[in-house]
Each structure stands twice: as C-alpha cells, then as structure tokens.
Swiss-Prot record:
Free-text domain note: HERV-K Gag polyprotein contains regions homologous to the matrix (MA), capsid (CA) and nucleocapsid (NC) proteins from infectious retroviruses. Evidence suggests that HERV-K(HML-2) Gag polyprotein can be cleaved into mature MA, CA and NC under certain circumstances. However, the exact boundaries as well as the size of processed Gag proteins have not been precisely determined yet.
Residue spans of biased composition, Polar residues class: 604-622
Main location: membrane
Similarity-based family: Belongs to the beta type-B retroviral Gag protein family. HERV class-II K(HML-2) gag subfamily.
Keywords: Cell membrane, ERV, Lipoprotein, Membrane, Metal-binding, Myristate, Repeat, Transposable element, Zinc, Zinc-finger
General function of this protein: The products of the Gag polyproteins of infectious retroviruses perform highly complex orchestrated tasks during the assembly, budding, maturation, and infection stages of the viral replication cycle. During viral assembly, the proteins form membrane associations and self-associations that ultimately result in budding of an immature virion from the infected cell. Gag precursors also function during viral assembly to selectively bind and package two plus strands of genomic RNA. Endogenous Gag proteins may have kept, lost or modified their original function during evolution.
Organism of origin: Homo sapiens (Human)
Record's miscellaneous remark: This Gag protein is encoded by a human specific provirus.
Biased composition (Low complexity): 624-640
Protein name (record): Endogenous retrovirus group K member 10 Gag polyprotein
Keyword Metal-binding in annotation: yes
InterPro entries reported for this sequence: B_retro_matrix (IPR003322), B_retro_matrix_sf (IPR038124), Gag_p24_C (IPR045345), Primate_lentivir_Gag_pol-like (IPR050195), Retrov_capsid_C (IPR008916), Retrov_capsid_N (IPR008919), Retrovr_matrix (IPR010999), Znf_CCHC (IPR001878)
Amino acid sequence: MGQTKSKIKSKYASYLSFIKILLKRGGVKVSTKNLIKLFQIIEQFCPWFPEQGTSDLKDWKRIGKELKQAGRKGNIIPLTVWNDWAIIKAALEPFQTEEDSISVSDAPGSCLIDCNENTRKKSQKETESLHCEYVAEPVMAQSTQNVDYNQLQEVIYPETLKLEGKGPELMGPSESKPRGTSPLPAGQVLVRLQPQKQVKENKTQPQVAYQYWPLAELQYRPPPESQYGYPGMPPAPQGRAPYHQPPTRRLNPMAPPSRQGSELHEIIDKSRKEGDTEAWQFPVTLEPMPPGEGAQEGEPPTVEARYKSFSIKMLKDMKEGVKQYGPNSPYMRTLLDSIAYGHRLIPYDWEILAKSSLSPSQFLQFKTWWIDGVQEQVRRNRAANPPVNIDADQLLGIGQNWSTISQQALMQNEAIEQVRAICLRAWEKIQDPGSTCPSFNTVRQGSKEPYPDFVARLQDVAQKSIADEKAGKVIVELMAYENANPECQSAIKPLKGKVPAGSDVISEYVKACDGIGGAMHKAMLMAQAITGVVLGGQVRTFGGKCYNCGQIGHLKKNCPVLNKQNITIQATTTGREPPDLCPRCKKGKHWASQCRSKFDKNGQPLSGNEQRGQPQAPQQTGAFPIQPFVPQGFQGQQPPLSQVFQGISQLPQYNNCPSPQAAVQQ
C-alpha cells in the first residue's frame, strides 16, 4: 500500500495530531491505526497531497472523488477509510467561508440505491468494487450524527461565541437561539454540517463573521504588559496618538464586507488556504477610532496603535537567507527592503530581526553602526530649521519614554522613517566573517571584465567605506574613469565633464562602454589600426614616441621634421638634374651617390657603395710552420716562402709586428 506505517506516521505526524485533537474535541474518536490506513490510501491514489496537510474542504472533496474513481477501476478501498474520510471532511466544514460552502453534495445519486439490489444485478467481480464504493455512504451518515457541532465550534471559534453574547449589533436576532443538531434521515447523505446550513439560511447574520478569524485567534497571546513592566499588574491604558496619521486600517474580521480592499482580501484568503496567513500580519497597525463626545469638525481623527509580532516563517526565511547568501547579497537586500517598506517597524522589531537573523559578530556590527547613525541623525535634527524633536532614545528604543513596545508603537511617522533609513544603512555595512572591506583605490577593472560589473564593485566598496552619500557619489564618478581599463577610458574620455545637468554620470558611462570587449569592438580596433581612419567617432593612433622629434603619434620614418630636412638637403646639394642613366647600375635616372641598386641592368651583383677598411694580416697561432699547398707542376713558378714573408714585413703598417720567421723559430 505504498509506504510503510512508520514512514506515514513520521511524515504526517503534526497533521495527524491536529486531526485527532480536532475530532476528539468534536466528540468523535478515531484510532491512530485507522488514520494511518487512510493516509496510506491517500498516499497511493493522491500523490499531490501535501506533506504538511491541508484544511481546505475542496482538497478533501477531491480526495473522495479520486478514491471513488479508484474503486470503479477495481481497487479495494476499506470501509474504515470511507468512514474516516467522511468524518474529517465534515469536521473541516466550519473552517470554510460561506463562499467556499456548497449547497449540493458531490456524492453521486446512486448512493441511495440499496447495496443488496446492486449485488443481485451485477456479477461477483463487480460486486466487490461496488460494495467498497457505495456501502460507505450510510456509514458516513451514521458517523456524522454523533458529532457535537456546538462543542466543535466552541473550540475553533472561541471569540466568535463570546461576541455573540455581547450585543445585538454583531449578530442577528435568530443567533441567540441555541444551535442543535437535527438527526439525518435514514438512507440519505448530507455532506455539509448543520451549522453551515443554518448560517446560509439565516440572512440577518453577518456574512463575514467566520472570515479570517480562526487562525488569528488560535495564536499565542502574551499576557498584557503592565505600566511598570511586571506581569500580573493591571494593564496600562491603550495608547492613542493625538497627531495625524495616514489612513492605515487594521484588518478587522468582524467588519462588514466592502468593495474597497477586495483584492487584498482575496490575497489573504489565498495565503490562508496555503497555510501562510501569518506573513500578512503587520507588526504595528493604526486603526482610526470613532470621534468622541465634543469632537469638533476638521479635527484630525484619533488612531489606535496595535502591535503584532513577526511570524516564525518570516524570521526563518531571513535566517536561511543570511546563512546561505550572506547579509548583503542581492536576495537579502531585496527581502529586507520589502519587509522594511511594507511594515511599520519600530526599534524593537529591528532588534528582533537582527538578533534572529545575524550571527553574534554580525549583530555587534549592526548595533555599532546603528548607534553611529543615530548620533549623526540627532545632529541633523538639531541643526534643522525648525529643529526636529526626535532624540537618540527614540531612535534606539531606550530610555524611560521609549523602552516598551506600547510606547514605541506611538512613534511618529517621521521617527519611523528615520529608524528605517538608519537601520538599512547599518545593515549594508555588515561584513561577512573572514572578509575585509577593500579600499576603493584598489578596485580596478580587469582587461576582460565588463564595465557594469566593475562599477557595481566600486559602488559596493564606496557604500561600506564612505559614510557621506554625496562624497561617495563623487568618489565613484571619479574612480569609474581613473580605475577603468584603457579601452573604457578612451570611450569615457569624450564624456568626462560634459554630462548634461540632471543626467546620471554613471549611467552615461555605462552606455558609452556598452559593447566594449565584444567581437564588433575588436573588429573596429583592427580596422582602425590598419587604416587609421575614423571609425565610430574615435581615432586610433600610434601611442609611442618618435625617436627623431620626441612627439607622440608617429614613427621616426614618418616624422614630418625628418622628411622636410631630407627634401631641403637634397635640393641644396644636387643643384642640377641627374643624367639620363646612373653610371653605376645603368638603369635609372639618378646620381651614383644616390644609387641603392644591388644588381645592374644585366643582373650582375654590384658592390656596396660604402668605404672599405684596410685588410688585416693573417696571424699564426700554432707552433708548426705554415706550409702552403702547391700543386704539382707549379712548384718552380712559386716564389720561396722566405721571399713572401720578406715582402709582407716591408708593409708600413706591420713594421712593429714580428716577422713570421721569428714567430716560427720561437
């Protein structure tokens, strides 16, 4: 039957406990063995069923339909499964709103047919499956008759029953009568519970009495905080703010339905069905109070501040995000901004949010930067004209006047905004463990790094190292050009100091560097290097210095100064035109001193036109005399070796050198 009993019990442990307590308080006892059997069948035929369970009646009706389809296909469904399914579905009916209730049962009409008549008409094989399909319906009817709906409603809606006895303004005239259970007719099945039927028939009862109330009332409520901070003392009077506040209203479950905010109610109802209604609770909400006696026209309305703590799910998401991505990752910054601007957070909320999400060292950094930001903000408040009456105790949530939650809930909107800005900036300065904040001077763009990535790194370092926002912006604009690579600098240089007023300098720089490093940009650079023409509004020239004049932009062979001098010298030295043919190469009209040919007109090599040096005499380095090789037949024609040496010794330039004979004798 799918998974074993132990796996089913561990998988749906919390949901099984909830179902058992719900049925027990409603007057129905179901054994754990039968519930495990039910969830084994659900696990087999309904794989979409969530592990955390569901309290939506539509899901349980869908389970019934799929189990009936499985029975029609020949699968055996035990009777206890049908019985437990019907009891749980009936117990979950009070959780549904009137819009979710259904007046007609989704059970097929053939449920009223006697099972014995079907077994006579069908074969033995079909009887077994039909028995599982239809016999459960009378059992469901018998099981639902013993449910004490008044007791079950008392558990689920405790505050609703209290409100019913307070006054006639919250209930209809027919609600004062006790609600009793009428016995079900024999042989018929009624899927909906009797209290839901009475609510629908009674038109005088408010339709939203059961909307958005159960989960809010089932939450744990701490004891009221006394004026002196000790539990058990008389509660302090509810604080009221005499100043004007925005028309923020608390979601009142007993308020009459209205068209305004219908989309918000739909979102809350959807999240409630998904099991995440706590995420829509605001820590501090302001509810306008009705005008009292003697109130004058035009007087700002008095509002009542109410506080609700963060949900466990929200704190868990923050903790997992910080642990997995880091406190200053883009995901965490977006999540923190949505919480900060979507809620009215007081200093106590920021402290709880930081303590539950950050490590001890990170929380110490956050607290340090928080205090530093408060001191700076207090100096600005005092220097303002007129001065702002917001002190450091209010921004930190300390002192005799701002230490309790009820006192912080009455903070002005301006103080709430200042606390939000200070805490967000303190959060941005938190460093990860083991990492150090580099200086903005060391942040340089790589040769292949995109320019937007370089600017993002530069802005991040500037935010963490520079406290003043204006100074940080100036530093970023300066370093965005100075620390960029040469290609981006050449693209930004025409825009430097020429960005029109009102435009973002960094945005213009990013636009100018768009496409640098790509294939198109590389092709443009190659074309500019080859042709030297203007492409894309830029001129690429030689960046080295000329060895002749020392200027940048050309080589020595292309130096205009040298070319001009050569032309002048040639014009002054020649003075007359060259002959028809060169006397050296015989193939050009130029002077022999200017001839650079290596071959003459017949293709014979020509000697160089440079002056030759004097030839050097041979030197004997060995101990044996040199015997020149003389072929046979020519021995008599060659002079003796002594005469050769004697002639060489008579050369004037070698008079100081020893003779070869002396060298041989030595």
